[in-house]
């Protein structure tokens, strides 16, 4: 049986895979596991992004939480990183975010945070899953005054915005910023925070209707933002994903500034200010080789973890580093928050822009990007993690690695949230890379149906 939890909580098509019944069971088991050591009636923050399925899942989740005697503190639509922050600020026992991040509207997800604002370890997720699948009878079913209640965190959005504005000493007067809010959870927080810090704004995709989240917008569809930056003469642009835990940027010329370049820009600025812990940036195996080359030039250590912001965070916590992230735009500023935070990332990058007096394109020039090609193979979800067990696929990967051994690298990995095997090639000949990546992806699709 496939594991219920993926790399970022439980995720699936709402109402068929992620049903109200499953949300109820997750609420019960999650509340129990995360609060069973507390000596008081536990309180758990619940928030969501703008998907139409959010109301259904919130109702079921809250019911599950209350049914084991915990209290649900409902915050409504706020970004995922707001949950991480507010759990700590309000001294709550846990937090839950209902979101499928960058996925299309038909998907939704549920991810938990502990009382310190961190995503759960594999061990805790396994404990929750084991109770749901095998031992639901151990869960309490109190009656009368033992039941939990629901309350509303009416100041949640304002408190999160106030936190964001305190993460910089800079004022952004005179800076024109373009925002693409992905019709998602950032649609209020990001514009208000930027305006409070003095920036002038032009905004797109900030009118969510429940169905338009991530729809040809946000950090996975950057064309609208690039066009708006150039047409409006903006100094920089930022795009968020559906739950606003990631951010990508666009310079004044309309060129992409991805997560690797954001790490390079902000990491170097931190080093120059004496604020970069152990002169180290934590990336992943998907980080562009250009980031490593920048690190060597600027005397900054670049470490690599497995793909996934949870693994970046684990390394940061284990060894005392304070900045890390992924090419996709998950950037963790551990001095400020315990998870990737898109609006916080935008504010930190704007702060560097303000301090330096440079244009965004000039800042991005500190890192030269090595060409990468990424092709997704859509496969049977039950087979995606066993691709190396297929002899034909294994030989195909070995042959590809041999072709690029001298002037590039090949990385094959599975998606933690979708039925995909990703083929990434880094090198110098883009035409050759693209052809070879597509060839291998087609082979993987054929073999893993």
List the predicted regions and their residue ranges:
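Short beta-strand-to-turn element immediately C-terminal to the catalytic PLP-Schiff-base lysine
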Residues: 112-115, 248-252, 332-334
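Gly/Ser/Thr-enriched, mixed-charge loops and adjacent short helices
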Residues: 13, 108-232
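N-terminal small/polar loop signature for handling phosphorylated ligands or for N-terminal nucleophile
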Residues: 32, 36, 40-107, 192-250, ...
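Proline/glycine-rich low-complexity loops and linkers
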Residues: 126-161, 166, 252-325, 332-333
């Amino acid at each position: 049986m496939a594991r219920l939890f993926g790399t970022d909580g439980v995720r699936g098509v709402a109402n068929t895979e992620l049903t109200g019944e499953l949300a109820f069971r997750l609420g019960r088991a999650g509340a129990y596991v995360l609060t069973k050591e507390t000596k008081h009636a536990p309180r758990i923050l619940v928030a969501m992004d703008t998907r139409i399925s959010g109301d259904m899942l919130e109702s079921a989740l809250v019911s599950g939480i209350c049914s084991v005697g915990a209290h649900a503190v409902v915050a409504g639509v706020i970004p995922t990183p707001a949950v991480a922050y507010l759990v700590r600020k309000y001294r709550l026992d846990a937090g839950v975010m209902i979101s499928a991040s960058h996925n299309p509207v038909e998907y939704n997800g549920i991810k938990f945070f502990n009382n310190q604002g961190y995503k759960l370890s594999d061990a805790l997720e396994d404990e929750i899953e084991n109770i749901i699948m095998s031992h639901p009878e151990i869960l309490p079913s109190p009656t009368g005054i033992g039941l939990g209640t629901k309350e509303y965190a009416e100041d949640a959005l304002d408190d999160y915005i106030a936190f964001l504005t305190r993460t910089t000493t800079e004022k952004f007067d005179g800076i024109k910023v373009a925002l693409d809010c992905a019709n998602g959870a950032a649609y209020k927080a990001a514009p208000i925070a930027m305006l409070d810090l003095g920036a002038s704004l032009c905004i797109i995709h900030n009118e969510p209707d429940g169905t338009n989240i991530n729809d040809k917008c946000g950090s996975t569809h950057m064309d609208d933002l690039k066009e708006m930056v150039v047409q409006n003469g903006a100094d920089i642009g930022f795009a968020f994903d559906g739950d606003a835990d990631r951010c990508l940027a666009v310079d004044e010329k309309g060129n992409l500034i991805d997560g690797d370049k954001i790490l390079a820009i902000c990491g170097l600025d931190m080093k120059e200010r004496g604020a970069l812990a152990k002169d180290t940036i934590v990336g992943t195996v998907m980080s562009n080789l250009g980031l490593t080359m920048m690190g060597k030039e600027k005397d900054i250590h670049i470490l690599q973890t497995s793909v996934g912001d949870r693994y970046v965070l684990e390394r940061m916590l284990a060894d005392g580093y304070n900045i890390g992230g992924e090419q996709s735009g998950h950037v963790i500023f551990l001095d400020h928050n315990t998870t990737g935070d898109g609006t916080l990332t935008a504010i930190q990058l704007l702060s560097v822009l303000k301090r330096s007096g440079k244009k965004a394109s000039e800042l991005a020039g500190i890192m030269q990007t090595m060409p990468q090609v990424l092709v997704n193979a859509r496969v049977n979800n039950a087979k995606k993690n066993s691709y190396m067990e297929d002899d034909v696929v294994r030989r195909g990967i070995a042959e590809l690695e041999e072709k690029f051994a001298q002037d590039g690298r090949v990385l094959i990995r599975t998606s933690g949230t979708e039925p995909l095997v990703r083929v990434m090639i880094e090198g110098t000949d883009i035409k050759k890379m693209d052809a070879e990546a597509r060839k291998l992806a087609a082979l993987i699709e054929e073999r893993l149906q």
